[in-house]
């Protein structure tokens, strides 16, 4: 008889739980938070609408679910912590965000800017960034086509 590794079955059950989620709305005590950074030891710095604090990853998520900067979480406050003020209840997926937005409980602070605004601000940033770049000394400098035409004219005059 073949037995699967315990962490594999735990991960499988967590993934199944996430997929079969009913997208229940947060309770009164739960908050929506965005991950700012990972602090190690299953601690993550998050921001909510009002404040920034640390949250802990519960044992059931450890080594099977990962969060990265910018991910959204549902957190529940814990009483025993000074620095660590909450524990992760749920890692929110784009489907959760869509449902929470429909229910009008998604914080305005976390609403994305319209695509057009992002593109124009990004283009401004890109052009500023390119202006600050030093020339690449590993490649020959491209000459303008107008310089080449002048060279051709001078060479034909010499003949």
UniProtKB/Swiss-Prot annotation:
GO function terms (MF aspect): RNA binding; translation initiation factor activity
One matching Pfam family: eIF-1a
Keyword entries, A-Z: RNA-binding
Biased segments, Acidic residues type: 146-159
Region of interest (Disordered), ranges: 109-159
Keyword Heme part of the UniProt annotation: no
Top-level taxon: Eukaryota
Keyword Mitochondrion: no
Domain S1-like: 18-93
Entry's Gene Ontology cellular component terms: nucleus
Family per record: Belongs to the EIF1AD family.
Database matches in PANTHER family: RNA-BINDING PROTEIN EIF1AD-RELATED (PTHR21641:SF0), TRANSLATION INITIATION FACTOR-RELATED (PTHR21641)
Protein name (database record): Probable RNA-binding protein EIF1AD
